[in-house]
Every structure is written in C-alpha cells, then in structure tokens.
Amino acid sequence: MSSRFVDNESEFALWRVKRARVGDASRRVLIAHKDKSIGDSLAVQLRQKGLQVIHSQDLKSVRALVQSWQPQALLLDTSLDSDSGYVFLRTLRMDADVPGRLLVAMSNVWPADPVQTLKDAGFDAHCRRPCATWRIVDLVEAFFSTPFTR
C-alpha cells in the first residue's frame, strides 16, 4: 500500500460501499454535528439534492431521531461519541436495519481519531476536517442514486 493511499485514507475514505434500499421513497439523512455552521451547510447542500435532512447537535437527540425518524444515512461528528469509545455507533451497528444504513464519520483535525479505530467502530466512510463538504454530499448522493435490490 502506497503512502499516498494511506495519506488520503486519513483524510477521506469509503470502506464499505452501500446503496439505499428500493421501495423506500423517503430519503432521510441525519447530520449529527456539534458545529452548527457545518451541520447547516451540509443540510442545505443535501436538501438541494432532494433529500430530507435533520441536523442535531447532541447525542441524546440523535439517539431519539435514529429510533423515531429512521434515517437511511447518518453523518456523525465523532466528537459526540468518541469519549465513550463509540458506544452509540457500536450499539447502532447491532440494529438489524443497519446493513442498509450509511454511517459516515466526520472527525476533527485534532485530536485525530485513528482511521483503524473508526473502521473498527463500524463506520462505512470517514471525512476528516477540513473536508470539503461536496465530498460528503457526493458520497450521500451516490448512496441514494443506485438503489440496492434484494
């Protein structure tokens, strides 16, 4: 593996390619990010793509929204869950519906979440700040553009 690939993976990576399930007309994305401006910016861009989006800034609300609103994609600011060792995400991974849900880690530049730790926690993709929001928007749009059929 070249050092260039490793450098890129530490900034942006997609480890598991997923597609939204066919038959679910709603396309819901939950943005869980402490920084209001980042969350709002992503929300605007994703809504322009025709997606339903909610932005939440705390893990308690995120937990409730995951259960009640059942988003197909979750963009999670890792600082909301890293102190617990990603207990929220690991618990979410045990949910039977998770194979069809896109889980994206949005981490800060410092302290840096180790890429392997994010993979082990169960994230499908990773974007480290300062990550261009268009990369996340493209990733989410691709998830919804080619539905998964069973």
Where do the PLM segments sit?
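Conserved active-site segment of CheY-like receiver
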Residues: K34, T78, M106-W110, P130
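Alpha-helical interaction/dimerization surfaces of two-component signaling modules
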Residues: V44-L46, L65, T117, L139
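Conserved phosphotransfer cores of two-component systems
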Residues: Q67-W69, R93-G100, A121
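Conserved phosphotransfer microenvironments
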Residues: L76-L92
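Non-catalytic signal-transmission and effector/linker regions of two-component phosphorelay proteins
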Residues: M1-K36, A43, A132-R150
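Acidic, metal-coordinating helix/loop segments flanking the phosphotransfer/catalytic sites
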Residues: H55-A73
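Two-component/phosphorelay signaling modules centered on CheY-like receiver
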Residues: D35-I54
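Alpha4 helix (beta4-alpha4-beta5 surface) of REC/receiver domains from two-component response regulators
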Residues: V87, S107-C127, D138
